[in-house]
């Protein structure tokens, strides 16, 4: 079931363009980070202040049907806006990895589980390791698990 509400495209033009191209092609185009060859997925959330639907491309870090959503923001000192969407609405999230989106629930990781998924994320996208050295915050990692039908 798709999230209900008004869709508010990203203020970032490249994000808007990538989401539109990915969705319109069923994930066959715009499915890598800006021609890097590194696969992405799109996740959909609700904004906690506006209630509007937001869509965000992130690196595809998948293992056994679960996905890590890494809130790196390039190693900036603050979290990306979408971090707050996931914190506010962890059960109101969709993920698209291919032609059809599916409902997921997310939870923020800690401890050994965080370390395990962080290593997986760095293996997929090595710049994450550099991002970690650029910030004093622990870069949040959420685990997205498909909801049972």
Regions found by a protein language model. Name each.
Residues 37-72:
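Short beta-strand segments
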Residues 63-65, 100, 149:
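Short strand-connecting beta-turns/loops that link adjacent beta-strands
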Residues 33-37, 132-136:
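Short coil/turn segments at secondary-structure boundaries
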Residues 4-6, 73-128, 134-138, 146:
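Short, structured beta-strand-loop surface elements
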Residues 43, 142-146:
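Short beta-strand element of the conserved SAM-dependent methyltransferase core
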Residues 1-34:
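Extreme N-terminal tail/first-helix region
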Residues 40, 138-141:
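Short hydrophobic/aromatic beta-strand or adjacent loop that forms the aromatic wall/cage
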Residues 29-31, 50, 128-132:
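Short helix-to-loop capping/linker segments positioned immediately adjacent to catalytic or ligand/cofactor-binding
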């Amino acid at each position: 079931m798709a999230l209900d509400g008004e869709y508010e495209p990203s203020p970032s033009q490249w994000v808007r363009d990538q989401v539109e191209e990915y969705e319109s092609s069923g994930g066959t185009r715009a499915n890598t980070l800006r021609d890097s060859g590194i696969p992405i997925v799109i996740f959909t959330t609700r904004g906690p202040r506006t209630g509007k639907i937001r869509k965000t491309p992130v690196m595809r870090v998948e293992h056994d049907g679960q996905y890590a959503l890494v809130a790196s923001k390039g190693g900036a000192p603050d979290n990306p806006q979408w971090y707050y969407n996931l914190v506010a609405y962890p059960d109101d999230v969709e993920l698209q990895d291919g032609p059809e989106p599916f409902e997921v629930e997310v939870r923020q990781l800690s401890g050994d589980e965080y370390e395990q998924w962080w290593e997986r994320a760095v293996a997929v996208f090595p710049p994450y390791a550099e991002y970690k050295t650029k910030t004093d915050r622990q870069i949040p990692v959420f685990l997205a698990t498909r909801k049972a039908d």
